[in-house]
Amino acid sequence: MGRTIRTIHQVVIGTGAFDAHMGAVGGEIEPYHLSKVMGTSTCDILVAPTEEMKGKLVRGICGQVNGSVIPGMVGLEAGQSAFGDTYAWFRNILAWPMNNLLARSKIIDAQTAVALRDEMIGLIIPELSKQAALLPVDESSELAMDWLNGRRTPDANQMLKGTMIGLSLGTDAPRMFRALAEATCFGAKSIVDRFVQEGIPVKGIIGIGGVAKKSPYIMQMMADVLGMPIRIHQFEHTCALGAAMFAAVVSGIYPTVGEAMAAMGRGFDAEYYPDKEKQAIYLKRYDQYRALGSFVASQIDGKSSVHHKTTITA
């Protein structure tokens, strides 16, 4: 190969890997700690010692492969089809007048209109988060499903759609945003629950990625919903850091991935702890979420079956 690409023979070339897997390593993943890469979607990575996984096959997740994340470990992968994209979708709905009408204003010039639009759009999610955090947590508020891009895990079904119920004339933008935020956190809990149901303990959560770094509101809510602490990794580019750790092992600087993580890891700069009172309410809300999800899935699956039969007989 060295002759083919004209490199000197002493150059060591490592094989590639998935970005989220390298991100989990860069984020200092530990056995049975769920590394949650949170951006537009999520990629949830968990590793377990190979000898402890004999005879275990987790149903309804994205993948389970020996050595796929760390040598000597079984890598398990799950994820949510829409996470940050859910918040961005709602922001874009609210921003429609700014994107489509502001440039036609006769009060301000075009350059000012563009600057004002960009400034206002940039403030939407931070201000929604601030106002939503002031709302009391209760059992009867608006409820949403986070399936705006289908469901990846557990039990992938890309036909599923998002839903929101409990709307009234008193429902405003912060309340709708709060419902969407809850839905994404409930989606995270459904993944944790699946691992636990399949005999895989989840001892903690490691948060990496854009949403983990930028949204204390979402991270605190997730800690409350999951009922466990969430550690946020200090380094912003954990995928690149993980790639560097693997390169250090390939080049012989460190003998194992674990030793590379210990030497090159940047640690954690924030930790969110669950509020027990809110957790109790969220458990009841989670039951409502699951019931709504079952209803939505039954309606969509029913329509899909009718369409499928019609297509076959046509």
Where are these regions (language model features)?
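Short beta-strand scaffold segments in enzyme catalytic cores
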Residues: 22-26, 42-46, 144
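Conserved active-site beta-strand element of glycosyltransferases/polysaccharide synthases
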Residues: 36
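Structural signature of cysteine-dependent C-C bond-forming condensing enzymes
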Residues: 4-10, 228-231
